[in-house]
Amino acid sequence: MLLRIANVFSREETARIRVALEQAAWQDGRVTAGYQSAKAKHNLQLAEDDPLAREIAEAMLQRLWQHPQFMSAALPSKVFPPLFNCYTAGGEFGYHIDNAVRQVRNSAERVRTDLSATLFFSDPDEYDGGDLVIQDTYGTQRVKFAAGDMVLYPSTSLHKVEPVTRGARLASFFWIQSLVREDAQRTLLYEMDQAIQQLTADVPDHPSLVQLTGTYHNLLRRWVEV
């Protein structure tokens, strides 16, 4: 399931973050890539211990843990601390699949990468190229969302970032370990949860809502890993 999570940050918040990122100390992005991925990666990145990166990452996680759509779709167990990248002057990242497990810096904690996420801080009209191209079961998907919006997709997906030929593409990227590791199961649970929420708004007293909600939780209980 590929999903757009809209308005994680408002336009005003995104503009302030973008100004701060434009003045940040960027470094070679290959430092966080695996052996194979490093061959295809040509971008800039903030150091994981950069104070600005940590500040924005903390704000992102606070916002996401309160975002109903994200919580419903991702069913997060662990979230790898968000990283930040910049593509400019021909920067690109060729086709690759994200590493299955990520080690949190200066920690024994490991995160299984069930879901990948990119939160955009540049609007599409601010740069040319830079499309996130994702190959999934429905074919090739091209993603270039508004600043403040986020894309969520399975980490098993082959994907790339096309060369940026004008301007700069600023974004955050990170990974989620879900309580439910299989994408098909997460998708079914998400669709059922969305239907329950809509029915609750439309016919809040319908007796079938209790049964449907019970079925959701019984499926979650069957598939969840805690």
UniProtKB/Swiss-Prot annotation:
EC number assigned by the record: 1.14.11.-
An example Pfam family from this entry, by short name, is PKHD_C
Q: Which residues does 2-oxoglutarate bind?
A: 169
Question: Would you say which domain of life the source belongs to?
Answer: Bacteria
PANTHER family, per the entry:
PKHD-TYPE HYDROXYLASE YBIX
| HAMAP family noted in UniProt | Hydroxyl_YbiX
- Name of the protein this chain belongs to: PKHD-type hydroxylase PST_0995
**Top-level EC class:** oxidoreductase
- UniProt cofactor(s): Fe(2+); L-ascorbate
Annotated PROSITE patterns: FE2OG_OXY
The residues covered by the Fe2OG dioxygenase domain are 78-178
Ranges that cross the membrane? none
Q: Sorted alphabetically, which keywords does the UniProt record give?
A: Dioxygenase, Iron, Metal-binding, Oxidoreductase, Vitamin C
Q: Which GO terms describe its biological process?
A: DNA damage response; intracellular iron ion homeostasis
- Cofactor: binding comment: Binds 1 Fe(2+) ion per subunit.
- Whether DNA-binding counts among this entry's keywords is no
Where on this chain does Fe cation bind?
Answer: 96, 98, 159
Q: Origin organism of this chain?
A: Stutzerimonas stutzeri (strain A1501) (Pseudomonas stutzeri)
Q: Name one GO molecular function term.
A: 2-oxoglutarate-dependent dioxygenase activity
